[in-house]
């Protein structure tokens, strides 16, 4: 039965839980985040959501017999990418599969290119460790990493895209999280949102929301796999 895990920032109860978790992160002192930096009602307004990108044709080429969605709502040390890789790797040559990854909630920054990670202190804020340095990541550790850094080279975002994986990033999380970290880069929330939008890795589609993407993938016949975390 189709289902989903994690917090949904788009319904009222899910929104409260989502912002509550942001507050908990702030209380822990992650990169100086504060609750007030997260509470921007405009981000979750109907007007903002309604102006989100049109991605209805995102999955038009999702035509394999075997299709799986990985719902990534936490970075979880890159395991959502690993799940996509193992699903693709275990299909037969006669019946290859399609993999869909939705990067939403706190996993959304995995969709950003290297240039934004140090500038916004993303690794420090969301406790993403670079497996090469064992320190908070100052670049996206899952995008074009050196050979042998990841558990499997083919789980990197660039290689998954090259293998035909469909990857989408939540526009709601993009706006919420860029606003939270805007002060790290010394810019306004509006400027941060524009920079994050421009910094999406080529081949990744910005979705109206992550839950929208989870829904569309399942409507297209994908089985569901949680990204964990």
Regions found by a protein language model. Name each.
Residues 11, 33-66:
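C-terminal segment of N-terminal export signals and the immediately downstream linker at the start
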Residues 65, 95-99, 162-168, 220-223:
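Loop/turn elements at helix/coil->beta-strand transitions in domains of secreted/extracellular proteins
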Residues 182-229:
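Glycine-rich, aromatic-bearing surface loops/beta-hairpins
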Residues 121-147:
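A glycine-rich helix N-cap at a beta->alpha junction
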Residues 78-94:
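Histidine-anchored nucleotide/phosphate-binding helix
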Residues 96-117:
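Acidic helix-start/capping segments at beta-turn-to-alpha-helix junctions
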Residues 1-14:
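N-terminal secretory signal peptides
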Residues 75-77, 105-110, 167, 172-177, ...:
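Solvent-exposed loop/turn segments at secondary-structure junctions
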